[in-house]
Amino acid sequence: MVRTRPVPCVPSPDVNTATRRNPGRPKKQSIGADLSTTISKPGRPKKLSIGADLTTIRKPGRPKKLGADLTTIIRKPGRPTKLSNKQSLTALNEPECRIRKCVVKIRRIKVKNGVVSEISRNDAPDVDASTFEPARNSTMYIPSKVQKSTQPQNIKENVAGPETSPCQQRIRSKSPSGPAAEISPKKPPRFFHRDQPLTRTRSSVTRNVFDFLSQSQIEDDSDREDPAADIIQRLVKDGKACVMVRSRKIGKPRAKRTAKKVRPVGNRRKVSTKDNEPEPVKVVPKSIEPRLQKPSRSLSTIFEPEEDYSNDSEHGYVQPIEVPVQVHVEPSTSKQAHEGAYSNLARSVMLNQTQAQNPLPSTDRRRELINMARQLVSTPLNRRAPPVTDVSATTTALSPIAHQSPNAVRTAGGKSPWRVSDDSPLPNTFMFGFNNSQMPSYSSDHVQRRHVYVPDSPVEHAENIPHEESICPPLHEQNHDSNANDSNEENRPPPTISKSMSINDQESEENAENFVHLPNPRRTLQKRTPFKDINILEVVTLPSWKKNVTATVSKEITPTRVAPRPMATSSPAQRSQTRSNLFGFDDDFACEDIPRKSTTPSKGIAPTSMSLNREVTPALANRNQTEVNTFGCNEILPCENIPKEKETNTEERTSSSQNLFGFDEFITESQDSPANFTGLSQNVNLHDKLHRLAELRPRDGELPQVSYTSIRSDCLGESHSKQTDIRYMLCSTMIAPPRPAKRKPAAPTARESMGLFRVDQDEPEQSFADKQPRRTYVKERPQRKRKKRVQILYIESESEDEDEQDSHDKSLDSPEKKRHHVKRPRRDIEHEAKLEQFVTSFNKQCEEVEKFPVIIE
């Protein structure tokens, strides 16, 4: 605040006895004349002058313009001229002007740190020494935006002074100028720089708002430091970055040319160490010291913030741009700590808040919470293998790589053959599943799962589990099986309940890594692992994708090893599904599947297949006779009476063919299908069963001989090349090469005449094959030939047409000739259309003839 000299020519007692003026617009009085101002009744406040002092006191009421600065008063051009001292005195002493009894004496005093100097305190009571604060509605009031963000609210103390008049009161406010000066100590005080040229704008009033904001948001601060300037300079110096400059000629940015400093080789080392010196001084000693005090512990992949990291979750803490502020360390007074976004005052306030709310033992509390979380969810780096018991160690491991000892340190991906550590003992040979590429499938590349918690004591849990298999798998399997890259997922039947569970099976469930071969193929809870062949539980032959193949045969191929309890394994839904897919062939299955005690095999049946009858799936074996009769097969003999001769075979065939829902006409065509699917199984015993099924069908001599050559090439032959089986889709499944059908080589000599007819039949197809390119989108090559054909239709003169051919390219300019060429081929198109119509009708007739089987008697 500026101390001003009181004007000696004004006697103070005269002012107090001033008369009250009538309400109205008062005359303007000069400020230099007297420091005492009259406050009239409320009216429209005048605009504040530019040099006005903002920290002046006022009495309650709406003031007239109090120009605080005595040196510079800038007036608008329309205002009246300044009154002299005499004029102002006469104006005051005139009897017309009634002055209110409220008199304000303004005295400017420098206040240091909010303490009024001794001189001002000892002054006469009528002289008020408090700082001036304008009212909210006055023109001298600073806008509310600025008031909120920069200055804390002024705390007013109403001190009752000596009552000179009933309305006189002194308002002493605790000035905020002391702490406000501390916010930016570098800059000169903003409000009272009288010696500088007065260019005062609205933005300069609100400028200290930005002390709390980051440096990047200060727009009008020219000398602020770029936080990343040193990094950019170092990058440019190292040659990793280049400064872009806008070129004067073109205006496009170009790289600024920097002169390369050629240093001698000896000095090069010294310069690099100088550049790197300031870095360790900043960061290293502070970060290392708290870590040295802690006991060393095993690392885990859970990220635990150390003490020297800033805790982002703490209340009111925001991480600065450049230097991470260490919350629990006392803030250093050096300049390095304050290079971030916050001013000194803001940083100290926030650090005091966080330290009050988070005392030092909060780190121990955080460590406790982290340990509690680690017990619940853990992702250990070195996953400990559960101890391998002797029983499971003897069983064959599925992976060809030998398991390491449980105490050995294992890498994250040690199980896969493609991620083998150098120390792990490898076998001499790798057994890969034979798919077509002779490479291991994706399921063999077993990636070890992260985020799986292995309990510390798996043996204790295993003792408590009763010897009973639950329907749902254990928790850790249930959660993560869907994520595993495991090809056995689609082959799983519905879960089974079987109480015959060995101790070995339970251990293999408890220990996630001890995978063993299990004798039961229908076991649901086993995991899919590399190099394991898939047990195909059920293969459904899909109906043919061709329209003319009407009869679809669907058979169930069963595994050899049968579950110990047959009824439990096959659910009723499965049985009904396989039952409905069997159309008319279920009687064969019913007769063949029921085990016979004393029957001698017929000629066609192999003796080995008879012994295997007991192993057939219970889904078919448990069918009773009433279930068979639902399909209308009442005439079928009981299954013990299976004939030993061919004649009764034919009788049974005819009786079953009556129940084929009208498909019995095509039974000769679909007879071949079971022989086609025999070669697709992995199991030797299944082959024998299917061969035995084929032998139950009638022989070639018993049926009228049908020529299969033409039909097979068109209708049925493509089913050999097409892979219509779901087993071709599965990975790591061994696919046997398809066997040739039996009936191809045994063709009778009577079919030679058919072959002759077929040669004759192929001729028209070959003769008209030249027309095929016309149907494509390719431009036709023989254009000249078409012109020759046109010449025959339009005979004018041969010489003209020959000239036309030669000059066709030259005469394209004339539009008349163009039109002529376009019109000419129309008759030729009609001719071709008739030809094509004849060809298609002839081909249709040939196809219809082919459909009828030629029976040679």
Swiss-Prot record:
Compartments, record wording: Nucleus; Chromosome
Region Disordered, residue ranges: 1-50, 146-194, 251-281, 470-514, 737-830
Ranges annotated as biased composition (Polar residues): 146-156, 165-176
Segments of skewed composition (Basic and acidic residues): 771-781, 807-816
List of residues that carry Phosphoserine: 173, 175, 184, 222, 405
Extent of Basic residues compositional bias: 251-271, 817-826
Acidic residues bias spans: 797-806
Source organism superkingdom: Eukaryota
Keywords: Cell cycle, Cell division, Chromosome, Mitosis, Nucleus, Phosphoprotein
Any one GO CC term of the record: chromatin
Pfam (any one): Sororin_middle
Major localization class: nucleus
Function noted in UniProt: Regulator of sister chromatid cohesion in mitosis. Probably involved in development of the central nervous system.
Protein name: Protein dalmatian
Organism: Drosophila melanogaster
Name of the gene: dmt
